[in-house]
Amino acid sequence: FFGSVRFVYETGIKNRLMETGLTYTSTVVVSKENVAATMGSGDLNVFATPAMVALMENAAMNAVAGGLPEGSTTVGAMMNTTHIKPSAVGDTVSATAVLKEVEGRKLTFEVRAQDSKGVIGEGTHVRYIVDKEKFMSKLS
């Protein structure tokens, strides 16, 4: 996708380096557990859209996990995808996320999923860097 561009963001503790171009691919085999009929998103035994979105989020999370400050994580905030084609039970689906933009704590990714026949979905995903303790304290 794009060449690497370096950004530094302020964590409140110390500066960390986050580079565009960071990439990760997550893979899953289509099974009874992740088809639309089981997940409740449809009534066919094909790879479910929610499963594709989760795989894309997993790839984005892992793309930047190694560069986060201690005590931080990322949380998904926006997903804009199209699910172009179905994937059959037994096929392998891979989702790749590429970090495209860093704006402070906001991370924007290009995401794409494919199976053995080609691209099955693509889109844009936004995650935010958060402090785990502060984030979880919002539950109470």
Language model regions located:
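Catalytic strand-loop segment that frames the active site of acyl-thioester-processing enzymes
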Residues: 15-47
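Short, residue-level hotspots on alpha-helical faces of the histone-fold
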Residues: 54-58, 62
